[in-house]
From Swiss-Prot:
Glycosylation sites: 125, 239, 346, 402
GO molecular function, one term: serine-type endopeptidase activity
Inhibitor I9 domain span: 35-115
Top-rank taxon: Eukaryota
Subcellular location(s) per record: Secreted
Origin organism lineage: Eukaryota, Fungi, Dikarya, Ascomycota, Pezizomycotina
Top-level EC class as recorded in UniProt: hydrolase
Protein name: Subtilisin-like protease CPC735_023170
Length: 406
């Protein structure tokens, strides 16, 4: 293994100075009026799905004629098929949704609700993320990131977020368009997605410096419907399995909200299809089991740490508990940003911790034979530094490490 050394040079950030990291107020479920996610029972075949959707259209048409349906409830909008998970979402009037709920092929009907990106606050501190995960101990005299020369080459990280500033020089042309679920420019006008993408795989700030970064634009702002996130995951799984990339890909989701079982089931199906899914634990300072997709047992749920005062400590905002499999740096992280070809920003949150781990998985996939999510998870946790983090509150006391030997 040939180790490379990278010393981060800090550039001017575009964000104001903050000195504290308050816990985000835990979000209550924010239901989107008249929008629902309908999950089919396991084992349903395609013919039955097509028959059901035709039936839904007929029910909707009948209720439109009766005056029950309005412009706000146009009917079926999006279909999902991830491995053995089949579902759809749409806007339905009360009469139509009650008929759907009673259909023998329907497992569950859930209101569609909001999920949010999980950055917390911006702060002008020196970035330390890649440096920390290439050292067993907190580096005091070594400001370098040590990494294998393969550096994620041939691997893919799918960033499900607000889009990516793909023209940024630090991506070196490796950030490519995947899918845009909105009728807007395929770019990032929010900044969160570009920042996460840079942590995973940019030249200066990234963990997997040679990986391909795939832009899966699910939100245009800091929040959106679960059904949009499910649509992005549906596309990602189909793309990964269609290109036979299961052993060379990770999906990174730095989005969180109150528990949504359909979203958790979609993650479960993605992993069963052979796709590794990494998610942020959330910034509520509470048990991650109360959030999705962090509560999905099949996901690799990531908490945030800081390394102030000479010790690694769980960030006060970071969700915790048995759902959290591993931690990574998440405070004062400098990375790529929106707006120009060289924009940077300094941000904090479990949103920043998760792409460290997604990038690390892509990095490890380029070095080791990791054919499926179980193997990727096993290698990640096998390498992780144990029992160094203060105040884990029931989370796994594991800190991401790239195996550099430093």
């Amino acid at each position: 293994m040939r180790l490379f050394q990278s010393t981060c040079v800090l550039v001017g950030t575009v964000l104001p100075l903050f000195t504290a990291f308050p816990i985000s107020s835990p979000r209550e479920i924010e239901i989107i009026p008249d929008k629902y996610i309908i999950t089919f029972k396991k084992g349903i075949d395609q013919a039955a799905i097509e028959a059901h959707t035709a039936w839904v259209s007929s029910v909707q048409a009948r209720n439109t004629a009766r005056g029950f349906t309005t412009a706000e409830t146009p009917g079926l909008e999006r279909m999902f098929s991830i491995h053995n998970f089949n579902a759809y979402s749409g806007s339905f009037d009360r009469e139509t949704i009650e008929e759907i709920r009673s259909h023998p092929n329907v497992e569950s009907v859930e209101p569609d609700s909001m999920a949010y990106v999980t950055e917390l606050i911006e702060q002008r501190n020196a970035t330390y993320g890649p440096r920390r995960i290439s050292h067993r101990e907190i580096p005091t005299g070594d400001n370098s990131y040590w990494y294998d020369s393969k550096a994620g080459e041939g691997s893919f990280v799918y960033i499900m977020d607000t889009g990516i500033n793909k023209a940024h020089v630090d991506f070196e042309g490796r950030a490519i368009p995947g899918v845009n679920l909105h009728d807007v420019a395929f770019d990032d006008t929010h900044g969160h997605g570009s920042h996460c993408a840079g942590i995973a795989g940019s030249k200066t700030y990234g963990v997997a410096k040679k990986a391909t970064i795939v832009d899966v634009k699910v939100f245009t702002r800091g929040g959106g419907a679960w059904s949009l996130l499910m649509g992005g995951l549906d596309w990602s799984v189909k793309n990964i399995t269609g290109e036979d990339r299961q052993a060379k890909s990770a999906v990174s989701i730095s989005i969180s909200g109150p528990t949504n079982q359909a979203m958790n089931n979609a993650v479960k199906a993605a992993v069963e299809a052979g796709v590794t899914v990494v998610v942020a634990s959330g910034n509520d300072g509470r048990d991650a089991g109360r959030n999705s997709p962090g509560s999905a047992p099949e996901s690799i749920t990531v908490g945030s740490i800081n390394s102030r005062r000479g010790m690694d400590t769980r960030s006060s905002f970071s969700n915790y508990g048995s759902s959290v499999a591993i931690h990574a740096p998440g405070e004062g992280i400098i990375s790529t940003y929106k707006g120009s070809r060289d924009a940077t920003a300094n941000m904090s949150g479990t949103s920043m911790a998760a792409p460290h781990v997604a990038g690390l998985i892509a990095y490890l996939q380029s070095i080791h034979d990791l054919p499926d999510p179980a193997a990727a998870r096993r290698k990640l946790l096998e390498l992780a530094t144990s029992d160094k983090i203060q105040d884990v509150r029931g989370s796994a006391n594991k800190l991401a490490y790239n195996g550099s030997g430093k």
